[in-house]
């Protein structure tokens, strides 16, 4: 049961605007998110299904495309992210992986004191908490139901999507 309000469809490439999109993979209808959790039984998400179709922006000689692989179905972001159930801090493997990401960033980018480090989709700020205190840490997280972890660091969290306004 999908409605036009919940799911729209890609009309052109998100990067270059090319309208020539080739279907690469089609998967029959799936629940959009979190529907296996018992606490979500009465949630609207348990009633919304959509197929998953990957499309490729055609970059052949006949087209001016960029080759981006993208999802054809677009689910309304608030349905997916305003009440998000996963927390990075609860998973030991995720914590280790995020710590490794921070280590790699510090080795490659070599940020300096007071540099701004931004985490888009910061969840509970697990990743940002692995950075040294000398940086200015900023997170963007649209989920309204997540408590942010702040282990003695000044982390500025925007409870919204990353956008041009904030």
Give the ranges of each region predicted by the language model.
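Conserved SAM-binding loop of SAM-dependent methyltransferases across substrates and taxa
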Residues: 124-134
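Conserved class I S-adenosyl-L-methionine
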Residues: 113-123
